[in-house]
Amino acid sequence: MKIALGILLAFTAATAVAATDPRTLPTKLEPAWQAKAREVFKQAIEIPSVHHRGQVPAVAKLLADQFRAAGIPESDIHFMPYEALPGDQTEALIVRWRSPHATRKPMLILGHMDVVEAKRSDWKYDPFQFREQDGYFYGRGTSDMKNGDVATTMAAVKLMSEGFKPDRDIIFFYSGDEETEGRGATLASTKWRNLTDAEFGLNADGGCASYDEQFRPLGCGISMAEKTFQTYFFTTHNPGGHSSRPRPDNAIYDLADALKKIQNYRFQPMQNAVTRAYFEARAKQEGNSPLGQEIRAWLANPNDGKAADAIEANPLEVGLTRTRCVATMLSGGHADNALPQSATATVNCRIFPGVQPTDVQVELQKLVGPNVEVKPDPNFIGVPTPASPLRPDVVSAVTAAIQKLDGPGMEVYPEMSTGASDGSFFRAQGIPVYDIDGSWGISPIDERAHGLDERLPVRAFYDDVVYWQMIFRSLAGGEGPSSTQAPVQPTAPPERG
């Protein structure tokens, strides 16, 4: 396929001089709307919408209140309760902003309201206390992804206040369990399809833009493909016994040996049309740097595992050349004075598109040997999904909006997401999805999603509201005060045979 090659833009050379710190530049969002958006963002962050805490409905109500106050009728606001993990009752929110004269199929906006657990003892500050400090907003969900929830909501509310009327319905879907089971997205793409059916979807889960630590723009990646999420449980068994009489074999030691094998193992490197186009762009950006040389070597020979390993050693490129698996949790033993009878490790894999999870299971089992049991998580069996096809209108809208806010050096390119999102469930059901949120950070120091002291630059949040306004105007046409922005058309390199 050549779906990505026609939209690839020339990157700014990596040898360019360091630019102004983007965190210090003024936002394009008016002060009154900054205050409104900040207050909603603060309230959202301070709701601990972690699984089993029952707080997702509070986030749904907060967002729904904004739409309702802007004029969306109650009949177009749907609270959808469901069970995610066993015993974990959560909720999704579906809101339809109707066009008075729809001429095209609806556009779907995706996000999720749940967040990953955060321990107060691990963080410098309370993760569920909204904090603004040194040009950043801190708190769990500031970058994954209550920022996107609030930005898309407030962009729509602001447009409604300005009298904008779209020429297609815009549907907002915010799930309640993206970080665990993805049950909400499964239901929304199937059972609730009458409420969510759309021509295409735009996912606000994850920012497309980033800068390096010298403040040079690294570009804006439109994710059109995702790796498949799959968790496996590795278990060892042993007769056990009294701890005063150690055996030569031990369930914990055996499991540790297996995990060391996983740590050192590298799956076969792979490329597809999206990742190849991405790395061609990165090679141009890197020039003749060591990383640029390794990328060109791997593009010339996709089986060059040494070059792929060197690429993956760069923190910006981890997970982009192959399937990756990593141990994430451990449990074992039953008493401090007894030899362990079993030990279990949770190993999470992000599988390259097109590779079946069953094939990865076979490969892992062969790696660790017959004495370690390898089984997939029965609560979630990953399903590989196809890449979304190129949509020039989406690319043009993203390019115009991101370059209006961050300058022409923020080039747009295709990419594959190493993470998993609700978009995969819609892709599997025939609705193409594009991950395009306009927020940004300094890479890698701001890449703290799921980690400690999660944060987002203040300007990145405010400008994201403006970004989504421009996206809605570009892709939903309509009536009302028009944007003064002239569209920026991407330049395309020659088509390859």
Model-derived segments and spans:
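Bacterial N-terminal signal peptides
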Residues: A4-T15
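Metal-dependent amide/peptide-bond hydrolase catalytic core
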Residues: A19-D21, G207-L218, I222-Q469, R473-G497
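Acidic/His- and Gly-rich active-site-bordering loop/insert found
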Residues: T20-R140, L159-R168, V347
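Stable alpha-helical elements in mature extracytoplasmic
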Residues: W33-F41, Q55-V59, L63, G148, ...
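Solvent-exposed loop/turn segments at secondary-structure junctions
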Residues: V50-H52, E83-P86, P100-A102, M113-E117, ...
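Loop/turn elements at helix/coil->beta-strand transitions in domains of secreted/extracellular proteins
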Residues: P73-S75, T103-P106, D167-I170, T196-E199, ...
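Short pre-catalytic strand/loop immediately N-terminal to key active-site residues, enriched for Gly-Thr
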Residues: Q133-D144, V412-Y413, D453
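Acidic/histidine-rich catalytic neighborhood of metal-dependent amide-processing enzymes
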Residues: Y136-F137, S143-G221
